Amino acid sequence: MSDSLAGNGMRQNLNRSSTSSNHTGHAQNGRAPQDPLVDAGHFIKQLACQVQSLACLKWLSELQILACIPLEGSRPLHDVAELANVPASQLSRVVRIVATIGFLNEPDPGHIAHTALSAQFVVDFSLFDSILFLLTTVVPCSMQMSTLTQRHGSAFPTNDGAYRIAFNTSQSFDAACVEGSRLRREWLAYKSNTTIVDETIADVLLRQDWHSLGHVKVVDACAQSTDFGNSLAERCSTLRVVVQLDTATTNGHSEIDSSMSRGRAVIQRRPQGTRQMVEDAAVCILKIEAPSTTIRARVTAELLAHLEVLRNNESAVLIVAAPLLPEPGTVSTSAEASARSSDLTTLQLSNSPQLELDRLIDIVENVPNARDSLKVVQRILFRNGMVAAIEVRYRASSEDQFATPAGTIDW
């Protein structure tokens, strides 16, 4: 009897173990299931699924299969395969894997229908341009990152890059975009669809409380156009706005084009890095719209160019707006991952990494001939919490960073 009870108990334990294993799908050999976040096998499987999903999206795009599926209702799989001239068996496999990520579905066996996600790709061609750019340009370049490092070691290459290695060319990515309309179109679509902020630096600056400043002069230094300056002047009539266009912006012409002169802002020409001529400015704005290999030199030159204005008027502010990476923990994990992915992409394509905030602060506070004089006193944020710009003032070295002393612009 005892043997029978022991056997029944053993069978019950085995049944419980089997049931537990079936429910979790992970418990094997008596081991507890692992957290997916630390399960290396799960991590690799997820990567494999993402790779195949990307490949399937490219397949669907290049064979124009989505256009064969009605936006409303469904269509038999064999009809879609016949219309697109693809094997029905392969189409079925592709549909079933992308269905796991919410792209297409199979409402009834043997029928294909759009989801809310896949339908967007039918009406917005820039979405597939983004996918194609990711697969045909970003992926090949990213795979050459190690080759580039092995070739140059710790030195930062200025005339070489992952793009040139991936496509075996001496042409830079920027030059290739100028020559190739398709590459340029795909790149612009990719940038638009991977941005993690839904507003521009100009949007952030325009929503500040400029009315609180009263009748002061604001300079948009090294501007690429008059758009921001005119918008600011129209929004706040008490400001006297000066837009300083770089020589390159006006193509070296001595006269400002009439289309640039429209609006309330006063237009001037000032080459980058030359002394700021508006000595009574309360606010000077330096907007760096895109990452650049020369960003340190450019910011340093502009800080020196504005040093006299800031020194002579300690309540004056220089706003430095540049593409900055989010500080760890300040935004959601997905937003930070997207921002850092974008940073690596621009680095691999054109050797133009984005700046970390502490790096920009280091540039500001270690300007030659101005050390311990220029301080970052304020941060201007995007709505998602990322830093859009910093405010720089001429201050005594004993004053606290990020404090707002009397007389300072406080948005």
Curated annotation (Swiss-Prot):
Residues 1-27 have a biased composition (Polar residues). It comes from the Eukaryota. Keywords: DNA-binding, Nucleus, Transcription, Transcription regulation. GO terms for molecular function: DNA binding. Residues 1-32 are annotated as: Disordered. It is found in: Nucleus. Gene3D superfamilies: Vaccinia Virus protein VP39 (3.40.50.150), Winged helix-like DNA-binding domain superfamily/Winged helix DNA-binding domain (1.10.10.10). Residues 47-117 form the HTH iclR-type domain. GO terms for cellular component: nucleus. Residues 77-96 bind DNA. Induction: Expression is positively regulated by the transcriptional regulator wor1. Expression is down-regulated during biotrophic growth within tomato leaves. The expression is induced at later stages of infection when conidiophores emerge from the plant and produce conidia. Disulfide bonds: none annotated. Transcriptional coactivator; part of the gene cluster that mediates the biosynthesis of cladofulvin, a conidial pigment not required for virulence but that plays a role in fitness and resistance to environmental stresses including UV light and low-temperature stress. With claE, coregulates the production of cladofulvin. This is Cladofulvin cluster transcriptional coactivator claA. It comes from Passalora fulva (Tomato leaf mold).
